[in-house]
Amino acid sequence: MDPMTNNIVTLPGSKVELFLEKGFDIWLHSYFVTGLVQLAREGTISLALMRRHDQVRCLAIQQEDYPLLLLKCTAPHHARPRLVCFDPRDQSDVWQKKALDECDLYFKRSTHPPDTAKLTPSQQSKVRPINPMFATWSPHAGGWTARMYWAFVRSALLQITKGQPLREAFNTCLRSCHNFASLSSVELYEDTPHGEKRPQVLFQTRLWDPSEEKGSWVDQCNRERVEMVRVLRTRLGNRCVGGLIRTPYAEKHYPDLLSNLTPTSKAKRPEFIRLCRQFLIRVNIKALFDAIPYSLGETLAANNCLVSETIRNSFATPLIADKHYLVFSTPNECADRCLELLDSPAKAQRLREEAHTYYRAAVCPKEAMRTYLTQALA
């Protein structure tokens, strides 16, 4: 199926089983699980926790420190179930090799063809790119919300039986519960081309503290982000909103560039998400390792005009420059693209309409997971 057409693929009689043990991370995996819950709610699939005898195989595949989501997918027309994994890590050159060998398909968030080409032909044939995504949860998840909390508790109990100190296991469980509770609903992110927007540009970014992070990338990354804030504020004036997220390092070294928006801690996520929806334009820059930031998926959901630094990685459904978003490679180019949209409401509206079509077909969790399951069970 072409995800950009109106042909809706259903998966009648298909069953998906979730592995929520070792390696499960609710913040990184919430998007995928949300889509599965939504598909189950509409009756497209049946969704269940993985049975114990299947978990043994997954435990042998999974690594404690690698946030991989494993699914067992069964379709009526297949004699053998498919084992599928989702890898949300930033790095395009880092793989969970055991999963690459054992799984039928390996969906990866950061997929860069030159890095994929370094794998064996057999491994390459299993790799599939993932569309832009973001951390979220469904308000209509029903019993799955309770199952998530129970999964965190059960994981902690399992770690205690393996000898992990009680306090450490408890803190891990508490952190997972907090992250889960802080997830915002899909609907909170979303807007349509009919929604009114403030004629301003939103750009927020974080600096890394060189005393805490090591590597030559730290200084370069910080310099680029500081320059972006300065250029946008100089070129756009009060039509540029945001700046450097408030951290001790940013407050000490760049007090004049601090953000004028609310702090973006997870505890205040709903407030920040509602605020971000208001702006006509949102600027996105690459994350570490050239990864696609979650904010790009959030921007598409909010139907802000997306002005993005050149995107290196691949998507399952192509995101097309000058159709779905405008692209830049320097801070001054970014300011130029923003001014184009601010000065041409008609162009901004067309961009929002095309981006909304893309979001509904390729990024909203339910349709994204429909696409991935269709590939897995083809």
Region locations from a protein language model:
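Nucleotide-sugar donor-binding catalytic core of glycosyltransferases
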Residues: 2-7, 13-74, 78-293, 307, ...
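Catalytic binding pocket for nucleotide-activated donors in carbohydrate/polymer assembly enzymes
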Residues: 257-261, 271-378
